[in-house]
Amino acid sequence: GLSLQNTNFKENGVSTNAKNSSIDYIAMQFRLNKRMGMAMGFLPYSTVGYDLTQVKSINKDEYGEDIESFHNYKGEGGLQQVFAGLGFKVFNNLSIGANLSYLYGDISYATMTSFNNTNAFSSVRSQKIIINSYKLDLGAQYTQKLGQKHVVNLGATYSYGHNMHSEGYNYTETYDSNSTLQTHSGDTINNAFSLPHTFGVGMTYVYDNSLTVGMDYTLQKWADCKYFNKEGQYSDRHKISLGAEYLPNYNGRKFWEVVRYRVGVHYATPYAKVNGQEGAREYGASIGFGLPIFAFRGRSMLNISGQYVK
């Protein structure tokens, strides 16, 4: 899967734009026997990429000129996921499955503070996280047909939370007005991060292979997780999502009859804390289309979507 992303950020009247493209995933699935299937693939687990600068007026010098501070916040990197999964149909209506993944990658954060006053020192605080660990996901799905045109699907998932094999690096440096290093301090912490226990439940209703309406709830137990061996840095995250997809004609022969139209909304509480306080709650809405390519009845799709998040 390939993706092209164009994102607009806005805060306190200041706007910026970011564009990126990536290979989202490479995955395959195949049947092992009548009741069992297997899947494997590679996909991004998380991505960090931002570079923001904030300017503040903090005082005046002896000449009446403003003394300004410049704060640059930068983050980059991400985690990749290689997975293999098995699914088994226990009964005609009930299926269970499990995915085992290997997570690897690194993420870097840096905060740089400087001043327009030539006598002031500047500072750089940076953190780097290197992770090589595993992830285990379990799931179950129950499908019930109600007559000829109605289908209800119920699902539940669980992701195992644990301490990850990881290394964390903390650095703090100060520089004088000539950019000469004055002080340097740092430390290394092993196995300082953890994944949250994650629980999810969901339901979809399908009418005549044409209209699908679904809802999903996820709880991530971030409050129990460590960040650089410190607890209490996070809060549990709750997310509720609602969505719908409409396919005009499942057996259609014309292009616009087999385009999939999608809408969705979601609400989520923050897991990160800012100065010990919970961050902003998240509200989002999306709209999208699934365009068939190569063949109207084929499985290949070009997905186009737009999302607004506040």
Where are these predicted regions, by residue range?
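Subset of outer-membrane beta-barrel
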Residues: 1-310
